[in-house]
Amino acid sequence: TGANMAGKSTFLRSLGVNYILAMAGMPVFADQLKISRFRLFSSMRTTDDLTHGISYFNAELIRLEELLKFCKESAEGEFCKESIAGNKVSLRTLIILDEILKGTNSLDKLNGSRKFLEAIAKQPVSGIIATHDLELSKMENDASGKFHNYCFEIDLGTDVTYTYKIQKGVARNQNATFLLNKILEKY
């Protein structure tokens, strides 16, 4: 979680880029990086396609369905390997999602996001998901250790101070109304 412009999306992109660089044996943008082998799936910048009749929300649903198929392939398909003992071992999926279901109303977004995260938690995945929806942070208490909350906090005074540092917990401060009020004060 975190306020607008606090660094959530930039962190997700940095994580994805560094993961790909590391898996390719290239230098990464970090002092140190320790990773495991995953199949990577990201959804960062969903766009509509009006020429094909696909609204923004529909594009989001299509992408989430692609993620579910991707996870199933990792668990059951060609990416599922046989171990020395003869057991099937799934190659886990690393998911990076930025603000899912933002193309719908607040209540549907919350309920749909919760339902999707409950479904994805049953898959062999690890992931990082950015959200403004603080209600979703309650899933940390409900999902037997499957979810953990981290945030990018800001300090609100006469202005906004961005720390750009990730920390354990849920963001306490939000800045959208604060920033809008700054604009409205000018007029």
Label each region the model flagged.
Residues 1-187:
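ATPase nucleotide-binding head domains, primarily ABC-like/P-loop NTPase cores
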